[in-house]
Amino acid sequence: MNKRQSDIIKVLYRNGGYMTFAELAEMMNVSVKTVRNDISAIKESLSEKSSVETKPHVGVKLTMDEAEWKNISGKGDCADKEICFFIIRQLLKNGNLTAQGLAEKYYIGRGELEKILEEVSGWFMENHILFERKRGKGISISYSEFNYRLACLSFYREYIPFFEGKVNVGDAKYAFLNRSEYSAMCAALDGFDPDRAARSIIETEQDFGLEFNYDSGVNLIFLISLCILRTRKGKSVTMPKTAKCPTDGESGRIFAEKTAEKLEKEYNISLSEEEIKFMAFAADISEIRQFESESARRKFEAMNIELCRFTVKAVNLISEVAGIDLREDRFFVKQMFMQLKATTSRLKYGIICKNRLLVQIKTKYPNMMAVAWFMENIFEKELELEINEHEVGFLALHI
């Protein structure tokens, strides 16, 4: 079966009803005779569970077994995922899209299109972006710059395989990504090269004597690259109004200022006060993997005195609930401090960092989850923050 015949199957399957040979010929940009020959070939290749029905003056209709459809399409659910990728990418790049153009590009019937648009609408809602459909105007989105940037990050992380190979790049010199991962990030940033931004971040990490974990490091490179990219486009961010949290500290701000100095020289741009605040936010929500020395750790703790006090209270509570004195376990206390730095910052801004291990943690370590949930009280009492189960799962991993 050739590609055109596969495309005809997709069109008929998604349409769900009769289509004329002329309609198919126009879509495939071939003659009606060619379509008739293709339909004959398709009939011969289908299993007994599937069939192609033709009616004079009505057209052709495909009835196909679901398993055979997935086998023939070669994609199954991935086909819908690819269409979702296209829609989200176009809307994030251009702000609008016509449903007709989408249907023509992917040969999607109305029922299939509605299903996909419902999924896309849910994705944008989850990322705090307004998704609108207006008759005669198509599909559009509206957003704050802050939510737009976080949505771009979510989109990149969720659809990395779809970005890979879309731009040709060499190996990264500073960004700790292999070629395919680096290519995906460049594509998600519309061709922007984040390697120099990665160098500035790494140099600031060295100044602080710390190292962020892998996932946080990737997110930080992406978000700070967006600062450069969006500033060049004249798209300024405004940080959301949030109540001051006792554990805020000064480390994020200092990290952002040092990084901004490097970036301004590297890219010959001027970063606004709001951009520096955004970079501080990006640093604060990042998880630290380790400090290079005790001296570096103490300096960082001095920038976050109230967080140190909150960590002590958290450790005391965990010790009491678990029936194990963990106050003298220096490794545990240090790990809890680093986790709480990112957790409190994410909760302050209402950021839900999805815990990919949550199901396994809840299944294998229910007792640790139960202990971690006891911390809900001090988050509310001391910080006026509402903790979610994803963050509880992160904390449970350290108990």
Specify the residue positions occupied by each region the protein language model found.
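A cross-family "folded-core" feature that marks the main globular domain of proteins
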Residues: 1-399
